[in-house]
Amino acid sequence: MQDFTIESLDAKEVLTYRHEFAATPQEIYNAFIDPKLFIKWFGPKDWNVVPNTLTLEPVNGGRKQFVMKHRHNPKFQAPMYMRFIAMKEPELLEYREALPTPQGQPSDTLVALRIELEEGTAITEDGVGKGTILKLTQGPLPQEVHEQTLTSWKDSFVGLTKLLDASK
């Protein structure tokens, strides 16, 4: 697997998204690296992480691997194979995901994912206040899948918001 930097990618193939949370950067960072929290929120609508498939080693070079299963049709599954390549608590998580082959094994095709967390003023459904601005950068992704990918992330962040609100 050949590595690359997000900055070296064609801008048309890079998805960027900004989301604001009424939570601290540390709380959000923990939700990405704590297995007990991660399985509660991650996944697009109607998809769940299968808990016993999760391997989460939150160190540079560590693995983040799991299978997501469709809630209404369990025959639909999606394996995920990632490696942490950069971590700076509670500000940065960066992965490289090896896309699965048709047989469900990791391939040599890599996609980068960077999550940056910055404390600041957040505007949420509850109003304006102290919170965290999350900046997501992902690619290379063909432009045709940007909308679907963004919808999946927004669905996941609805779950993360519910988890964070429940812990208050």
Locations of regions flagged by a protein language model:
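A generic structural micro-feature
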Residues: 9-11, 56, 74-78, 105-109, ...
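Hydrophobic/aromatic beta-strand elements that line small-molecule binding cavities or substrate pockets
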Residues: 19, 53-54, 79-86, 110-125
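Intrinsic-disorder/low-complexity, polar/charged segments enriched in Ser/Thr/Lys/Arg/Asp/Glu/Gln
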Residues: 12-18, 25-27, 63, 79, ...
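Beta-strand/loop substructures that line and gate deep hydrophobic ligand-binding cavities in soluble
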Residues: 94-154
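Short amphipathic alpha-helical signal-transduction/dimerization elements
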Residues: 157-168
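Hydrophobic ligand-binding cavity/cleft-lining segments
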Residues: 1-49
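Hydrophobic pocket/interface hotspot
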Residues: 28-29, 38, 64, 84, ...
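Short beta-edge strand/loop motif at the mouth of beta-sheet-based domains
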Residues: 16-17, 36-77
